[in-house]
Amino acid sequence: MSALEELITKAKALQAEGHTPGQISDELGLSMETVTWLLTQQKGMEAPKDVHIDWAAVGSHGVLLNDMAMMMLKRFLYLEEGGDVRAIEDLPDTVVGIAPSGAPLATLIAAEEGLKLAVYLPAKHSRSEAPTGSLSGTFSAIAAQRCIIVDDVVTTGTTLSETIAFLRQHGATPVAVWSLFDKRGAREIDGVPVHSLFVISRLG
């Protein structure tokens, strides 16, 4: 079975389990456009230009996941493009993890630095007729907080734009986006700087 056939099989299996296209997009690290194609593709149709990132070997192991979270933290503190090293005091008040994959990373970062933790539930996970994003009531409020947004993969930037807008509408100030992988090559999204560990580029 080819890699593409495996993705089609995985996408259809997740759909059969009741996952929404948005949830499948997060599970497979693919754009919504690609997921739609995987679920509906017909022979002869050209696949969207996308890159599948499978980091389950790291995400499924607590110690390795913590290592990745600490790399994200150090990327922000010690590898600033201008050459300056940030102080721990420069960290904002709250770490906002985008569910599902950004939440465990955000938890580890918040625990390491003694910061507040919030979890954002994006609109694409909602099953309502008019889907909207929301903040989990179990974790920190964000009003008047300076926030870092954490996610695993930047694909199109749509979910991050949604999160940034939500935070601003609710009185918070998003100061940075941290991600493991950036498939868009974004330096900023809606005026918020993006700090990624790895940037994925297609040639040609």
Curated annotation (Swiss-Prot):
Residue ranges the record marks as coiled coil: none
Its GO biological process terms? pyrimidine nucleobase biosynthetic process; regulation of gene expression; UMP biosynthetic process
What molecular functions are annotated in GO for this chain?
DNA binding; orotate phosphoribosyltransferase activity
Query: Pfam families this protein is in?
Result: Pribosyltran
Q: Which domain of life is it from?
A: Archaea
Keywords of the record, alphabetical order, are:
DNA-binding, Transcription, Transcription regulation
Q: Which Gene3D superfamilies match?
A: 3.40.50.2020
Q: Which InterPro entries match?
A: GfcR-like (IPR022854), PRibTrfase_dom (IPR000836), PRTase-like (IPR029057)
HAMAP family for this protein: GfcR (MF_01214)
Q: What is known of its domains?
A: Contains an N-terminal DNA-binding winged helix-turn-helix domain and a C-terminal regulatory domain (or effector binding domain) resembling phosphoribosyltransferase (PRT) domain.
Q: Indicate the family of this protein.
A: Belongs to the purine/pyrimidine phosphoribosyltransferase family. GfcR subfamily.
Q: Which NCBIfam families match?
A: PRK02277.1
Could you tell me what this protein is called? Answer: Transcriptional regulator GfcR
* Organism, as annotated: Methanoculleus marisnigri (strain ATCC 35101 / DSM 1498 / JR1)
What are the top taxonomic ranks of the organism? Archaea, Methanobacteriati, Methanobacteriota, Stenosarchaea group, Methanomicrobia
Q: Which gene encodes it?
A: gfcR
